[in-house]
UniProtKB/Swiss-Prot annotation:
Has two structurally independent, non-interacting domains: LEM-like (also called LAP2-N or LEM-D) and LEM (also called LAP2-C or LEM-B). LEM-like binds DNA while LEM interacts with BANF1. GO terms for cellular component: chromatin; nuclear envelope; nuclear inner membrane; nucleus. Residues 137-242 are annotated as: NAKAP95-binding N. It holds the Pfam family LEM. Residues 431-452 are lumenal. The gene is Tmpo. It comes from Rattus norvegicus (Rat). Mitosis-specific phosphorylation specifically abolishes its binding to lamin B and chromosomes. Belongs to the LEM family. Residues 154-177 have a biased composition (Polar residues). This is Lamina-associated polypeptide 2, isoform beta. Its main location: nucleus.
Amino acid sequence: MPEFLEDPSVLTKDKLKSELVANNVTLPAGEQRKDVYVQLYLQHLTARNRPPLAAGANSKGPPDFSSDEEREPTPVLGSGASVGRGRGAVGRKATKKTDKPRPEDKDDLDVTELSNEELLEQLVRYGVNPGPIVGTTRKLYEKKLLKLREQGAESRSSTPLPTVSSSAENTRQNGSNDSDRYSDNDEDSKIELKLEKREPLKGRAKTPVTLKQRRIEHNQSYSEAGVTETEWTSGSSKGGPLQALTRESTRGSRRTPRRRVEPSQHFRVDGAVISESTPIAETIKASSNDSLVANRLTGNFKHASSILPITEFSDITRRTPKKPLTRAEVGEKTEERRVERDILKEMFPYEASTPTGISASCRRPIKGAAGRPLELSDFRMEESFSSKYVPKYVPLADVKSEKTKKGRSVPMWIKMLLFALVAGFLFLVYQAMETNQGNPFTNFLQDTKISN
């Protein structure tokens, strides 16, 4: 007959189940704790070891009374002697370990005096899987260990301890304390996680409300005092909310000058108001010391009907709300714009000025396509070709001078007639002159007289 253990708490939960099933013991329905299987093992299996021992004692004679501690070292011979020896040795070791007083049971244990290794062992005993214990994480693990010890003390005080009658039940009770290590019970760790999650949530819940209130107050009042107050009060909150609040304050300061811009600050330069255009030119001369640019600017003022509408001046004041723009600064900005336009005109003198800055010329018609007749002018470059396109971009005075030159040109037959008249006049003058010996035509004249 096999011998069963007096202390089945040494076995694991699965081993207990297999032993009970092998010995035809009915298991309770559902998943139970280890203590339930230990009690079943003691009731059904460990109880089988006692009747043979009692019968043997009665047959021998008077019973030999001895304690359980003296009975454990004596090996019991039988069919399962070798198995019994191994299991008995394991049981003896377990009872010796559990009989020792544990450091966690001491109430006067100081957590701060423990070393890192001892602190790690204490946390492992409570079923916590800690990480590396360093100087920064030690305080956190000490607090965690204190919480676990407090919870363990509360659970011990709330649950009444059962009365134990025999030494076997003593060993079973001692072993049942360790049964939590091998069970799947993680109630302590779950409670601990909930406590850790609640602490940061309480701290974070208040910040969005205050930020929202501050933003509403900031949007309602655009004063500088309100902006500084929101920045100072939101300085305690770190990270993104502070940056978002400061961005809102800067946007608010940029929006404020829109209400301050009045039509009286805009400069209107046209034919009706001339007194304001001349001081602008004077300030430009004084600030830039460039008479050429100033002359160009005044010329542009004369030709333009309306320069820089009101919206442009309001945009300038919106971009720089810190100080109001003076007439000199506005003049300098308009000067820069005009100078850029003049430079473009100097680079491209024959380009037409368009609002978009893109100019296009008309395309010459394609001859020979769509039934159009071919002309000789299409294959020969003439002066009229250049005069068709270039005069469009030439100033008005140059066009007038070219027209006058074309009107003075004289036809060829008139030129030949004038040349003949001048030649005949010269011949008559020559004939009217006195005869002279040095005349080269004297011999010719004498021959004509003789022939007559």
